[in-house]
Amino acid sequence: MKKRALISVFDKDGVLELAKFLRDRDVEIISSGGTYKYLKENNIEVKEISEITDFPEMLDGRVKTLHPLVHAGILAIRDNKEHMKTLEKREINTIDYVVVNLYPFFEKVRENLSFEEKVEFIDIGGPTMLRAAAKNFKDVVVLSDKKDYEKVMNEIKENNCVSFKLRKTLAGKVFNLMSAYDAAISNFLLEGEEEYPEYLSVSYKKIQDLRYGENPHQGAAYYSSTEFDGAMNSFEILNGKALSYNNIKDLDIAWKVACEFEETACCALKHNTPCGVAVGENSKEVYLKAYDADPVSIFGGIVAINRKIDKATAEEMVKIFLEVVAAPDFDEDALEVLRTKKNLRVIKCKNTPQAKNYMVTVDGGILVQGEDNKLANEYKVVTKKEPTEMELRDMIFGMKVVKYVKSNAIVVVKDGVATGIGGGQVNRIWATKEALERGKGGAVLASDAFFPFRDCVDEAAKNGIKAIIQPGGSIRDEESVEACNEHGISMVFTGVRHFKH
């Protein structure tokens, strides 16, 4: 029985080689629209789909392959006598290969196009053929990914057929693709309508397999959103090895912290926790301030600066071991200096962080929440003493940092530098003591949540703290305010909590 292949692709890379390979094996090629013209122009013997259906393309190409003569040829089960009798009666030929890739909705939805223009890139005929062929994979070889063309050709060369195992894998890839494609369309159409829809569909594409996860015994891979360009799916590696699982997680937080600030800012980070954060006039100044805040923890850490890095900054950075240095750009002479460290990963971050929903898996489900991107409802002074202008700036600085520290979290600040960071403690007084121990000489203290008792204020007073900022909201707020008044400390309530679990 003569075999037939239906080829209809938007991305034509590799399709000529595949079509020629099939024609050399006497497989009849059927095609439509632009693919038909492309194959014909390249001297591939091909039939237009309208020759099979006796029905022309219509509605500006919206209807080309949606026809029973096409889909019956794909869906007929070859060892089902009734199916084959029906095909014979209707003079329908079987289709044994379906080679289809889709309109580039993933790419177009991210471009600056009108709603109507984006809708036109929603493919209908392609998914319908792919799903039909994938359902009948026992009898039909379905190719939705150009990377699989060679695998299929190799099996045919070696065995004169495509194995059941590969057919099944290719069918699975179709439904995997369709799941992501439909999710992207769904999210596009529901954007701004339902923040938390009944069914959660997300669309991510694998960028790379990672050597391992958090630890060597854990497998891992990195997936990129198909729906928007965030900071972590658009960076460029300018030096060093590929990023690890831990590198990517750490870089994400370090870059977010640095981008919290309009002024030049640096975040040094280790194990997903900031260890030094500073703002200032230039990249060298903020790097040195962040380094001085904790010269021990920064070793082997990640550094992100929200401005172009110059040679003077790079010369300071290469004095110690760093895993990653990230910035929006680098001077050429700065890159030359950084590249003297062969294993130092130098990352150009092209985009600022996007405020999208945050997801975390639990056993049997996913929790979804909005990003913590609201700093305060107000800055309400609740004590007799008011903070100075500089203290208020440091308070706001502290709140921008503390929301990235695991709760319970305290940050001590002086002159635009996080001099002490205490986090991940199961009670607030321990976090306070940790931050104060590291941040001796700090003037301002920021807390991610309210003080349940006055003990944190008393501890802060012992260590010279002059101003405190916190959300407020405890039934014992008055005790903390009274303690501040006793010690001559100003206190500001924001009304916004920043737990990080």
UniProtKB/Swiss-Prot annotation:
One of its GO terms (cellular component) is cytosol. GO terms for molecular function: IMP cyclohydrolase activity; phosphoribosylaminoimidazolecarboxamide formyltransferase activity. One of its GO terms (biological process) is 'de novo' IMP biosynthetic process. Its EC number is 2.1.2.3, 3.5.4.10. Pathway: Purine metabolism; IMP biosynthesis via de novo pathway; 5-formamido-1-(5-phospho-D-ribosyl)imidazole-4-carboxamide from 5-amino-1-(5-phospho-D-ribosyl)imidazole-4-carboxamide (10-formyl THF route): step 1/1; Purine metabolism; IMP biosynthesis via de novo pathway; IMP from 5-formamido-1-(5-phospho-D-ribosyl)imidazole-4-carboxamide: step 1/1. Pfam families: AICARFT_IMPCHas, MGS. Residues 1-144 form the MGS-like domain. CDD domains: IMPCH. The keyword Nucleotidyltransferase does not apply. Keywords: Hydrolase, Multifunctional enzyme, Purine biosynthesis, Transferase. It catalyses: (6R)-10-formyltetrahydrofolate + 5-amino-1-(5-phospho-beta-D-ribosyl)imidazole-4-carboxamide = 5-formamido-1-(5-phospho-D-ribosyl)imidazole-4-carboxamide + (6S)-5,6,7,8-tetrahydrofolate; IMP + H2O = 5-formamido-1-(5-phospho-D-ribosyl)imidazole-4-carboxamide. It comes from the Bacteria. The IMP cyclohydrolase activity resides in the N-terminal region. PANTHER family: BIFUNCTIONAL PURINE BIOSYNTHESIS PROTEIN ATIC, BIFUNCTIONAL PURINE BIOSYNTHESIS PROTEIN PURH. Belongs to the PurH family. This is Bifunctional purine biosynthesis protein PurH. It comes from Clostridium perfringens (strain SM101 / Type A).
